[in-house]
Amino acid sequence: VFSPDATQDKKGTRDIYVAVSLKDRENLFVSHDYGDTWQPVEGQPTQYRPTSLSISNNKELVLTYGDTPGPSTMKDGGVWKYDIAKNKWTDISPIRIKKDEKAGFGYISSSIDPNNPKHMIVSTHHLDGKHGYTSDEMFRTTDGGKHWKPIFKTGFRYDHSKAPYTQVAPLHWMFDIEINPGNPEHAIFTTGFGGWETFNLSGVERKEPVVWSIMSSGIEETVPLELYAPEKGARIISGVGDYGGFTHFRPDELTDGSHSNPHFANTNGVTGAWLKQE
């Protein structure tokens, strides 16, 4: 990331920060000469590896950490803020863990409202029932990380209308989350089954359901592996990656769900008996 008030000229921005996916050694570096030379940032946590790096307009870095790069299981992690001017690190993790304990999960992404540096969101990876959560979570703060509110645990609603088949997919892999720079109520997160957006992010403050809508309209987040067109019945039977496959009676209409009984994560081949189509 580039320091928001750093010197800029024909060479570019002078002050640059880079996080590297390293563990048990220095993993955050700064350059004050346009990237010609680099030095490790003092006092940084090294017990995990960085998973995201954000910078606010008041010169504070926010880093999420995990003990693996993902998407494999994470057993430890945290969220830290670095005040560049004061050279001060602060643990602002939404779920605080005792010093001698591991979190049992990690943090994977962060976003800072460019118009309000105290407004941030972060997402977890592999959060489970150990801390009272049933799935991964997105946390929101409006005071710079002193207090956090869970968005999904507090109350939310999904709108699957653009892609009904996503109703069977659990919340997971929120590896990128973003607050719209032009609208702080508009936030986006990506998962293994598409992108989602909300236009009432602050609903969590009023205990109103935050509504998340699937963004896949004409673009499906999957890989077609096989197509079969029987003479009778369905027009097309598809085999796809991750979702198994679908039975399409009308190719121009969305299906409600994927194959079941049996269901395969990946369906690599589909065929039928041509002399006995039923």
Language-model regions, residue ranges each:
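Extracellular glycan-interacting surfaces
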Residues: 1-278
